[in-house]
């Protein structure tokens, strides 16, 4: 899915604003090297033989495009003091501030990674990877995830290019979000800012405490906005939902709605969700004793939950003033009751790779119809 496209509507929305230039001193080359994971993909031979300046330009250009600044240009240079500076044209002068905040938070992640390595817990195939290249201004919702897969850094050099984010972007489009706008809903905070092999989840469980300062600062910076409602957040997967409970108090179940306070006096709505990739495991017949019907039933159940969570995220992102509980109840009714046949068809189309006609026929069979009767999961709310 091409996530850098900017819709005409978004471009028009920004065209009426008075733009100028944003300038930011990113720090000395040593600092920028570690915060931008430079070089991203070199092992004697570089997959992309970019300089440090080209690497920074790449990620900052991703950000300005995802913020809707279609005409903005990014120039990165190094001065005589070996400081790396960025000039971004046709954006508000204030545009530099969220970037500065992100990199300052990144220093906390670097400090945590350094301690982790000192304690002998850093793996040879891990990379410190901050959430670079995402929208800095045009944020609609926050996604709290576990860790980025290594190929997002080494191959794609795009934090939003992964099977996980691609699938969730698709679910957002099923809930009325234009494909060009999904990056605004997918501002990611990973509790382990480590690009690692997809199989490394268990190994990363002992790393979270090293990044506590980074994690809590990022959640606060990303969700809270001056003079506006906090952005809604979705917590994906069991490790992340457990982290929310340990850090903020309330237990977060799948489709469980809670409220956290990243800062005194603030309340951020948080919805628990499955990990976006969990459905492929749940719907694998090798995990149900070879029983295909049982695997399909498990996948259908999870598809209903995932569509409900994406619906809530889309609705709250469009209107942060909407009632979190009412939005969740409406979404659950839609995808698990009134439109459960569509939920079924989307499951067979996207997970089983059926054609629309094949999916429609499958959803009319007796075994699937019986599974759909049990699709509804009670909504758990703790506010």
Regions found by a protein language model. Give the residues of each.
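A polyanion-binding, active-site-adjacent surface
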Residues: 23-232, 238-245, 274-281
């Amino acid at each position: 899915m091409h996530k850098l496209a900017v819709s005409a509507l978004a471009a028009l929305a920004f065209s009426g604003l008075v733009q100028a230039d944003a300038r930011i001193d990113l720090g000395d080359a040593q600092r920028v090297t570690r915060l931008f994971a430079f070089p991203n993909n070199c092992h004697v031979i570089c997959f992309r033989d970019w300089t440090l300046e080209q690497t920074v330009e790449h990620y900052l250009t991703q950000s300005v495009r995802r913020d809707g600044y279609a005409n903005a240009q990014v120039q990165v240079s190094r001065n005589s003091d070996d400081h790396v500076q960025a000039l971004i044209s046709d954006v508000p002068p204030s545009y530099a501030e969220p970037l500065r905040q992100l990199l300052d938070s990144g220093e906390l992640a670097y400090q945590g990674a350094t301690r982790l390595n000192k304690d002998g817990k850093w793996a040879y195939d891990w990379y410190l990877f901050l959430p670079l290249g995402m929208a800095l201004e045009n944020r609609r919702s926050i996604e709290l995830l576990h860790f980025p897969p290594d190929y997002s850094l080494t191959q794609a050099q795009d934090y939003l290019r992964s099977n996980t984010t691609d699938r969730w972007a698709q679910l957002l489009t099923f809930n009325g979000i234009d494909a060009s706008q999904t990056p605004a809903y997918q501002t990611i905070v990973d509790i382990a800012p480590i690009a690692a092999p997809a199989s490394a989840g268990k190994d990363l469980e002992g790393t979270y405490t090293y990044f506590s300062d980074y994690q809590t600062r990022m959640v606060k910076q990303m969700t809270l906005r001056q003079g506006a409602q906090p952005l809604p957040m979705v917590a994906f997967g069991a490790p992340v939902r457990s982290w929310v409970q340990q850090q903020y108090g309330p237990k977060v179940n799948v489709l469980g709605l809670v409220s956290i306070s990243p800062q005194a006096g603030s309340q951020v709505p948080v919805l628990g969700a499955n990990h976006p990739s969990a459905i492929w495991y749940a719907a694998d017949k090798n995990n149900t004793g070879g029983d295909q019907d049982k695997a399909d039933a498990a996948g259908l159940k999870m598809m209903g939950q995932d569509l409900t969570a994406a619906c809530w995220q889309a609705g709250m992102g469009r209107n942060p003033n909407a009632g979190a509980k009412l939005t969740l109840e409406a979404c659950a009714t839609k995808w698990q009751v009134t439109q459960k046949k569509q939920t079924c068809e989307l499951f067979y189309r996207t997970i089983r790779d059926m054609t629309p006609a094949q999916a429609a026929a499958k959803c009319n069979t007796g075994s699937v119809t019986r599974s759909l009767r049990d699709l509804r999961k009670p909504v758990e709310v703790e506010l």
